[in-house]
Amino acid sequence: MKKIAILALSFLTVSVAKAQDAGGLRIGIKGGATYSSLSGDQASQIAGPAFDNDLGSFKLGYNAGIGTSFPISSDGFFSIAPELLYNRKGYEVKSKQMAGTSEIEVEQQRVLHYLDLPILAKINAGGLYFELGPQVSYLFGSKVKQQTTTKNANGTKTKVDNDGSFQDYSGVKRGPSDKSDLAQFDIAGVAGIGYQTDGGLSLGLRYAQGFNSLIDSKNTNNDPKAFNNAFTLQLGYLLPLGR
């Protein structure tokens, strides 16, 4: 009985050691911070052609979801890593327009709720890894906050926080949660670098550049070209499932 117990313990030890090989099949969770904005020569025109716009800084959001890693070489040097992530992206734009002798400033912040599906090729070199590949994103929600400041010629000014209703690029008024002026899907290229321990803990930094223009008012053929771009910093734990 004692010999059987020793053999069983030895087998379990070897199995765990193999399962913890960084090159084996893994599945787990990932999450972290997202810093996003818009890019493109026409990105500053998203509030409409009548406005002089200035894109704000990158907006802070977050991401969380499921990650996997499938080895495609026996030593684990190459692997494929599909993920399914919720990603809170967005942008900020400040617009100015003259109305008679008054200057109207509109500050608009827009939150974009995405489901991201990156499918990345990974090179695993010791704990260090590099990743590159495409990402498909589905926009399932949007929320707008807007503040209007009117500066009068006599030096007075008034600030109004509206209910989030806004006019899109083509001049159509939309509600704060309306996303019909935006493209529903995005295709992006992703590149990243990170470190993963043999036990499955990881820290990674990646950049995603969208290739499909975000603005799609569907009422004009002259929508400005503006593309999502985002940096993400992720912590993860991928449970080894063996090879």
Name each model feature, range by range.
Residues I4-T13:
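Sec-dependent N-terminal signal peptides
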Residues S15-A19:
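Sec/Tat signal peptide C-region and signal peptidase I cleavage site
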Residues R26, F227-R243:
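Outer-membrane beta-barrel "beta-signal"
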Residues I29-G31, I80-L84, I119, F130-L132, ...:
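Membrane-embedded beta-strand positions of outer-membrane beta-barrel proteins
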Residues A33-S37, Y86-G90, A125-G127, V136-F140, ...:
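Transmembrane beta-strands of outer-membrane beta-barrel pores
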Residues S37-K59, K89-H113, L139-D186, F211-T232:
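Extracellular/periplasm-exposed beta-strand and loop segments of Gram-negative cell-envelope proteins
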Residues G67-P71, L120-N124, G194-Q196, G204, ...:
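Transmembrane beta-barrel domains of outer membrane proteins
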Residues G76-F78, G127-F130, G199-L205, L241-R243:
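Repeated loop/turn-to-beta-strand initiation elements of outer-membrane beta-barrel proteins
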